């Protein structure tokens, strides 16, 4: 896994429909929950939340820096229906660093160029985009590599 992804958060006092005022100020509301803890409403700067979501997705742990440090996985996001550059809400699931988690990790096709099958005019199709992986949060891979160099003829699989 690459470098640690961090997000500065603060506890959110504004609740309910009043969060519209936060959004207008460039703040994204959210929540952190997990086993053995009460759900905690949080907030963070909207640009940072979007950056973290683009980097981490739902398969990379994020270090939440607030009054307490927590490791969490992004569980759910609510995007704006009309804007692609902002999130209305984000939910984090707090995890323990010493307990395995299950996450869907993307599969990337890799190789040193075109496979023999592609040079023969065949098309390489990727049937799975993601696969479930069980690991400690800080050991989760960014992606799993599927080498295509060994594809030679029709029907070959990775």
Where is each model-derived feature located?
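Extended basic (Lys/Arg/His-rich) segments that typically form rRNA-contacting surfaces
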Residues: 1-157
């Amino acid at each position: 896994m690459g470098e640690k992804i961090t997000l500065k958060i603060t506890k959110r006092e504004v609740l309910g429909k009043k969060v519209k005022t936060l959004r207008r100020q460039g703040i994204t509301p959210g929540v952190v929950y997990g086993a053995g803890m009460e759900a905690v409403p949080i907030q963070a700067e909207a640009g940072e939340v979007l950056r973290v979501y683009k980097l981490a997705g739902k398969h990379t742990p994020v270090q939440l820096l607030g009054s307490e440090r927590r490791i969490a996985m992004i569980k759910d996001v609510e995007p704006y229906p009309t804007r692609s550059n902002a999130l209305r809400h984000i939910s984090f699931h707090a995890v323990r660093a010493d307990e395995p988690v299950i996450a869907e990790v993307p599969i990337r096709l890799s190789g040193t160029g075109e496979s023999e099958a592609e040079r023969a005019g065949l098309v390489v199709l990727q049937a799975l985009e993601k696969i479930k992986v069980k690991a400690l949060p800080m050991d989760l891979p960014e992606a799993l590599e599927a080498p295509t160099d060994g594809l030679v003829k029709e029907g070959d699989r990775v």
